[in-house]
């Protein structure tokens, strides 16, 4: 477990839960968290993020990996394998649900069915990066989260 401070919030960044989610739900060929792309997000009243996907089969990029970062992929692998893709996305809820209204993370599947992520503080959601999702408009308070992506080789 690696603990990190984000402002006055204490969070736990633990690959264990992401690996477990992958084992139990996806079985994707993954390298690691793209550590250079983890983002602290906050939504104040009126803020939102429109419908989008974080990655698709045609969206490749060079990961932001620094030597000695603890990421389980070497720079040689990046150079040999070239580009990678975002395969899993994750969001760690940092705010208490009672501290804000609105700001729900909403998903939509290919059948048009909609789902909402839990809002409890400490909830980690892990989902396929090709899943269409959004953050609905924040109505009051402040919604805080950490979001990031797990990368791997191109889709086969």
Positions of PLM-derived features:
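Single conserved hydrophobic/aromatic residue that forms the stacking wall/gate
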Residues: 1-14
């Amino acid at each position: 477990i690696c603990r990190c401070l984000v402002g006055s919030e204490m969070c736990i960044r633990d690959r264990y839960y992401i690996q477990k989610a992958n084992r139990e739900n996806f079985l994707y060929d993954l390298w690691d968290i793209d550590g250079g792309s983890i983002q602290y997000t906050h939504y104040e009243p009126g803020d939102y993020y429109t419908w989008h996907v974080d990655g698709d089969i045609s969206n490749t990029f060079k990961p932001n990996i620094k030597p000695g970062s603890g990421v389980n992929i070497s720079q040689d692998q990046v150079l040999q394998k070239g580009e990678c893709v975002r395969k899993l996305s994750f969001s760690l809820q940092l705010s208490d649900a009672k501290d804000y209204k609105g700001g729900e993370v909403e998903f939509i599947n290919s059948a048009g069915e909609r789902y909402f992520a839990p809002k409890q503080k400490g909830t980690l959601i892990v989902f396929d990066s090709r899943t269409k999702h959004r953050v609905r408009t924040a109505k009051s308070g402040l919604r805080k989260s950490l979001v990031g992506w797990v990368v791997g080789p191109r889709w086969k």
